[in-house]
């Protein structure tokens, strides 16, 4: 029903509205998939748990609940697990992921990074959640799905040329990070995927979920046993590597706020690389300093 409405709006065919109304009239209840509905639908279709495993999940919750707020350190309007029931309903996903991935889809649509068919992205989100859950079907109990895992094959295949172009340089650079240590290279790719998603949400959403090292760290958490500080330290190294190679730039936080990061555009990247490639020899530096010194002394006289 909702798809029909959106198709009519897209086509701008006013005279078809009456036909649409007649079709809708055959249904007693119009079920909306807007707002928080993807969470409800996903829980029922994909994440609904068998009764016999709920006790096991309850035990897992009690084992880890003291660490959730630390491992999944999130901005105020994004949540981890509020209760045992919440945990059972969402596991192995984390509640904030539904809100954030919807913001990513909406923004990618506006930027032209994904096909127009993604409109009505509630269904696209359900498909991404389903494909991610399916890919983790054999994972051990206690494993959490991290946000970067939502950027999976299905998501990538939906990228238009414009979206692919925006992330290609970053991924190529990430694949050169500590190539003698495959796990470090994989982490660099994960960081790029997360940054690509959260650096491209709307300006309003970025105020709520800025691209900081802490937030990137939270999005990469996939277990409760690896200390958060260990993950954060590795993320910082990757971020510095990407900054040094003119993939992203650091923007200093104001009034004590943490620094944020954003991708260079292709044009900005070329300029940054050109500036970085300019080598000034010692003689040139000496001449420049001499000129400055002479001008300063002359002004004093």
Identify the residue ranges that each predicted region occupies.
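Extended alpha-helical interface modules used as scaffolds for assembling large macromolecular complexes
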Residues: 2-5, 12-22, 75, 107, ...
